[in-house]
Swiss-Prot record:
GO terms for molecular function: nucleic acid binding; tRNA (adenine-N6)-methyltransferase activity. One of its GO terms (biological process) is methylation. InterPro entries: DNA_methylase_N6_adenine_CS, SAM-dependent_MTases_sf, Small_mtfrase_dom, tRNA_Adenine-N(6)_MTase, tRNA_adenine-N6_MeTrfase. The gene is yfiC. This is tRNA1(Val) (adenine(37)-N6)-methyltransferase. GO terms for cellular component: cytoplasm. Its main location: cytoplasm. The lineage of its organism: Bacteria, Pseudomonadati, Pseudomonadota, Gammaproteobacteria, Enterobacterales.
Length: 245
């Protein structure tokens, strides 16, 4: 490995089929995003949208999981993060399939005629709190730039009738998000509560909504077993991505 490559790989996350540099992004690649990217239903999708793309992690994961005919649009408001996402995509096997847009999602969706079978987002979820060190991190953590009602509205404007809109959120915020989504006409179709181990309460929730009514399937995912190694279920979900699984 060359010295420059070694330096690059300390600034990001190496997966089996791609590398995500994230040193210029406010929010880094982590378990939440990896869970969402591996969990979101991709069967039969033709076009995907990643709202708040950050480093491009979710778009890259979806590209790995879908056929070569699937097109993925990734929209990111912060210019430095969008540039890094573009660089990550350019170094991946899926340059021709992923389009990164530096844009405000509220403005971007009004210009689109295409509809998406799958929309995915790892959204900001804090309404207020301690001031962050940078405006970029504040934007990534707090809902001031993209509140949940606006996010749901934007997704509704560009999703297909049978499409899925998927998010990952802290458990309690996910419950509030679900109530809001239902009040806006969305239908909850998939829910996975995520706990660190069997002894702990769920701390994250994966949610999939659709404009179309249907049965809701719910389950629970435990990340680590009694031996503190990754559980069989978590391994099965993510082993296509983690380098050493």
């Amino acid at each position: 490995m060359s010295q420059s490559t070694s330096v690059l790989r300390r600034n990001g996350f190496t997966f089996k089929q791609f590398f995500v540099a994230h040193d210029r992004c406010a929010m880094k690649a982590g378990t939440d995003g990896i869970l969402l990217g591996a969990w979101a239903p991709v069967a039969g999708v033709k076009r995907c949208l990643d709202i708040g793309a950050g480093s491009g992690l979710l778009a890259l994961m979806l590209a790995q999981r879908t056929s070569d005919s699937v097109i993925i649009d990734a929209v990111e408001l912060e210019s430095e993060a969008a540039t890094q996402a573009q660089e990550n995509v350019a170094q991946s096997p899926w340059l021709e399939r992923i389009n990164v847009h530096t844009a405000d999602i509220q403005q971007w969706v009004t210009q689109q005629t295409a509809r998406f079978d799958l929309i995915i987002s790892n959204p900001p979820y804090y309404e207020q709190g301690v001031e962050c060190a940078t405006p970029q991190r504040e934007q990534a953590r707090y809902t001031t730039s993209l509140d949940h009602q606006t996010l749901l509205t934007c997704a509704a404007e560009c999703i297909t009738e049978e499409g899925f809109f998927c998010v990952v959120l802290p458990e309690q915020i996910g419950n509030s998000f679900t109530e809001l989504a239902l009040s806006m006409g969305w239908h909850l179709r998939l829910r996975t509560d995520v706990a660190e181990n069997e002894a702990r309460l769920p701390h994250r929730v994966l949610l999939a909504f659709s404009p179309q009514a249907g049965e809701c399937f719910s389950d629970r995912l435990v990340i680590r077993g009694p031996d503190q190694n990754y559980s069989e279920a978590y391994t099965a979900l993510t082993q296509a991505f983690y380098l050493f699984m």
